[in-house]
Amino acid sequence: LFNLKVLYHATTEEYSKAYKKLIERFPSVVFIKQGNFKQDTLEVCKSFSEPTIAFFVDDDIIYRKLELQEDFLDIFKHGVCSLSLRLGSNTVIQDTHTGSRAIMPQVDGVINDKFYCWSWKNISQYHTNFGYPFSVDGNIYPREEIISLFDRYDFDTPNSLEGAFNKEWLSYRPNMTCMELSCLINTPLNLVGSSQNMAGKFFGISLEELNEKYLKDCYIDYDKIDFSNIMCCHQELKMEITCNFHLG
């Protein structure tokens, strides 16, 4: 479904060893060592030929089968800025750490009997994921349009790429879409980068521990993770680790 390119940065020799192992494991994926984050991000975006683009971070999981036919591009004919894979009628919690809610707004229509459409502009004054059109957690955008917006501001991490983005730049596309149920979950169990949040409060596991396990052939076993009660875009899930597990 996606033509994948991974922009990565290893801060220690042990992390470099793990990335080397990962690169060998997935030879069909293009891995790009990060230098200048903004410049590298723009170059990666421009290197694609597809009309759309999506961004993911390393704690995103596509947990539900995702099937998109080419006609999904029709959504962009309806003033839609993005197709969100992280939103759906099931994502009723805004923040699992505080318990705040994010009820799906009134739907203005359903495009191609699949894509639920609403005006993010009408609810943008509320602090809710349904009123924020830009995310690095699996939103799909028109590629050339989003590249032109990246030239407007400075960013040096995925968090600042999202956090410093001015949503009013997308006012000319006042609508968002999602499918009935979300397909992607961000499970924040540890913290990468300089931004601070409450990651890892419930099922935290350190980067060092995950990396050490990976180098010892212990892997996250996604088949054993409980995805039965996804209620939030950012929701901690307990990771199940299997050692000496043969991948493919």
Residue ranges and their predicted role:
Residues 138, 144, 148-248:
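C-terminal catalytic/acceptor-binding lobe
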Residues 42-52:
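Active-site nucleotide-sugar/metal-binding loop of Leloir-type enzymes
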Residues 32-43, 63-64:
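A short, glycine-/small-residue-rich helix N-cap motif at loop->alpha-helix starts
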Residues 31, 54-55, 81-86, 140, ...:
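A structural signal for short, well-ordered beta-strand segments and their strand-loop junctions
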Residues 67-154:
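Conserved catalytic core of nucleotide-sugar-dependent glycosyltransferases
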Residues 4-9, 57, 84-87, 180-193:
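Short beta-strand segments
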Residues 50-61:
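Short beta-strand-to-loop acidic/aromatic patch adjacent to the donor-nucleotide binding site
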Residues 1-33:
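Acidic donor-binding segment of Leloir-type glycosyltransferases
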